[in-house]
A protein has these predicted regions:
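Mid-chain, well-packed structural core segment of small domains
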Residues: 76-100, 104
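Well-ordered beta-strand positions in beta-sheet-rich domains
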Residues: 21-23, 89, 134-138
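Hot-dog-fold acyl-thioester-processing enzymes
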Residues: 2-83, 87, 146
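Buried hydrophobic positions in well-ordered alpha/beta secondary-structure cores of metabolic enzymes
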Residues: 17, 34, 63, 70, ...
C-alpha cells in the first residue's frame, strides 16, 4: 500500500550521490493507457500482428513510458513536490516488453547553489540488469519542505469493446459464407448490417421486400446494394413467406428479421421452421468485468416457459455453447433465491432441471440451480453464500426463469456494462436473427456471425439428438 503522505526532499537535504528508485512491471494496460493519453498509436505498440513482424517481434512499450517513470520519481519523491523540470535527455538502449520489470534509479550528480538547480543521472534497467534507458535531468529543486496527503488516484477501466467485438467476428474466419435471407429489410440498419456482413465475407445476403422501398432506403443512406440479390415482394407478409420458402427449400441457411413486428414475425416462423426442438433465443454476451463470454437464454421467444419448455431451452443453449467452443458448459438456472421455495415456481423448475441432468435426461453440461444472478457469476458472492458447486460463481450459461427476467438482465448488461453481444434463435430448421430497433450495427453483425456459426455446425454430419 502506498504511503499516506507525499513528502519532498529540499535542495539542502540532498547531497551529491544520493539516489532514489522506483520499480514497475509493464502490463498491456499500461501500453493502452499511454496510447490513449498521448494519441501515439504507432503499430509497434498497439498492433500485435504488426509488431510480430517487426524487428522486436512483439509489442513494446512507448519509449516515453520509461521517461514518464523518471518524471514520477522526480516529481513525487526525489526531490518531490515543488520540483520544476528544466531539461531532460534520454538515450534508449533496448526495448521494454510486456512483463519486463523496470527499475528507475535517480542519482544526484551536481548542485548549483546560485539558482538551486540540480542535475540527476537517470538510469532504467530491466529485470536482468540490462540498461534500457539512460539520461540526465536538470531540475529547479524545492527549497521549502512540503508534506501533503497522497492523492488517491481514480480507478481506470479500459474499454476493450472493439477488441472483444473483433474476437467474436474473427470466429467466422475460414468459414464458407452462408446465404441469408433478410425479410423486409426496408430500414437503413438492416441494409447496413447486410452489406457489412457481405463485405466481411460472412454472408451472401438476399434482400426480400418491396424493391422500390428497399432501393430508396439504400439510396437515402448511401448504401451500395450492387452485390446484393434483391427479390421483390409487395409487403412484409409476402417477404416473410418468401423467406420461409427459401429456408424450407434449402436456398437459405439463415433468416434475418427486417422491419416486421417481432410477434408477427415469430408466429409463422415457429409454425414453418419448428423441428423436434422448441425454438428459443440465446444471447452471446461479453462484458469486461467477467473473465469470459457467456450465454443468456431465453430473452426473446418463450414468454412464460413451462418446465418442459425450459428443458428444450437448456438443451438448445448447451448445444450453442458447444458450437461456441465450450466443451462442458456450466449452466446456472436463475431464480430470485438460491433455495427451493414451494411458492416460487422458478426455484422448483430449477431443482427439477438439475435432477434431470443428474439422471442423464439433460447431457453435455453441468447444471446448478436455483441460483441468484450474483451467485452465478461472482465467486466471492458464491463463497459468501456457502455454495460449493462447479457452476456457482463461474457460469457459462444463464437460464432465465422467463422472458421478462432474461430481457431485463440482458438489456441492463448491454446498456450499463459495456457489453458486446449478439443473439440467435435456435432449435429451428435454420438459425434466425431477430432485430431490435436499438441494436447497433456491430451488434447486428455479431448476431449474423453467430448465425453463421450455427449454420456451419448444421452443415456437419448430425449427431444423435439428446
Amino acid at each position: 500500500m502506498p504511503a499516506a503522505f507525499i513528502e519532498n526532499r529540499t535542495y539542502d537535504e540532498i547531497a551529491i550521490g544520493d539516489s532514489a528508485t522506483l520499480t514497475r512491471t509493464l502490463k498491456p494496460e499500461d501500453i493502452q493507457l499511454f496510447a490513449v493519453m498521448s494519441g501515439d498509436v504507432n503499430p509497434a505498440h498497439v498492433d500485435p500482428e504488426y509488431a510480430h513482424s517487426s524487428m522486436f517481434q512483439e509489442v513494446i512499450a512507448h519509449g516515453m513510458w520509461g521517461g514518464a517513470l523518471i518524471s514520477t520519481v522526480l516529481g513525487t519523491e526525489f526531490p518531490g513536490p515543488g520540483t520544476i523540470y528544466v531539461s531532460q535527455t534520454l538515450r534508449f538502449s533496448r526495448p521494454v516488453k510486456v512483463g519486463d520489470t523496470i527499475t528507475i534509479r535517480i542519482t544526484c550528480k551536481e548542485k548549483f547553489e546560485h539558482n538551486k538547480h540540480m542535475i540527476f543521472d537517470c538510469l532504467c534497467t530491466n529485470q536482468d540488469g540490462q540498461k534500457v534507458i539512460a539520461g540526465e535531468a536538470e531540475v529547479l529543486a524545492p527549497t521549502q519542505k512540503i508534506k501533503r496527503e497522497r492523492y488517491e488516484l481514480p480507478e481506470v477501466t479500459i474499454s476493450d469493446r472493439w477488441a472483444r467485438y473483433h474476437r467474436l467476428i474473427a470466429r467466422a474466419k475460414g468459414l464458407s459464407a452462408a446465404t441469408a435471407v433478410f425479410a423486409h429489410p426496408v430500414q437503413a440498419e438492416s441494409l447496413q448490417s447486410a452489406v457489412a456482413a457481405r463485405d466481411s465475407g460472412i454472408l451472401r445476403p438476399v434482400l426480400v421486400g418491396p424493391e422500390k422501398e428497399l432501393r430508396a432506403a439504400a439510396e437515402q443512406s448511401a448504401i451500395d446494394l450492387k452485390l446484393c440479390r434483391v427479390v421483390n415482394a409487395p409487403h412484409w407478409r409476402a417477404a416473410l413467406a418468401q423467406a420461409l420458402d427459401m429456408a424450407r427449400s434449402g436456398d437459405a441457411e439463415i433468416i434475418v428479421q427486417g422491419a416486421i413486428p417481432t410477434h408477427e414475425f415469430l408466429l409463422p416462423l415457429i409454425a414453418s421452421l419448428r423441428t423436434d426442438r422448441r425454438l428459443s433465443h440465446a444471447l452471446y454476451i461479453d462484458v469486461p468485468s467477467y473473465p469470459r463470454p457467456f450465454i443468456i437464454s431465453d430473452m426473446m421467444v418463450n414468454i412464460e416457459p413451462a418446465l418442459e419448455d425450459k428443458v428444450e431451452i437448456v438443451r438448445n443453449a448447451v448445444d450453442f455453447a458447444h458450437i461456441m467452443g465450450i466443451a462442458e458448459p456450466k449452466v446456472a438456472i436463475l431464480a430470485g433465491v438460491d433455495t427451493v421455495m414451494p411458492k416460487m415456481r422458478a426455484t422448483l423448475d430449477a431443482a427439477a432441471l438439475c435432477k434431470m441432468a443428474d439422471r442423464g435426461q439433460i447431457t453435455g453440461a453441468v447444471l446448478d440451480g436455483p441460483l441468484g444472478f450474483d451467485n452465478a457469476v461472482s465467486p466471492e458472492a458464491a463463497r459468501g453464500a456457502h455454495l460449493n458447486s462447479p457452476v456457482a460463481g463461474q457460469a457459462d450459461v444463464l437460464i432465465a426463469p422467463d422472458l421478462e427476467a432474461g430481457n431485463m438482465l440482458a438489456k441492463q448488461l448491454e446498456h450499463l456494462a459495456d457489453a458486446v453481444s449478439g443473439g440467435v434463435v435456435l432449435g429451428g430448421a435454420v438459425p434466425v436473427v431477430l432485430a431490435n430497433r436499438n441494436d447497433s450495427i456491430e451488434s447486428r453483425v455479431a448476431s449474423l456471425v453467430l448465425a453463421l456459426l450455427v449454420a456451419n455446425h448444421a452443415r456437419q454430419p448430425r449427431k444423435e439428438l439428446r
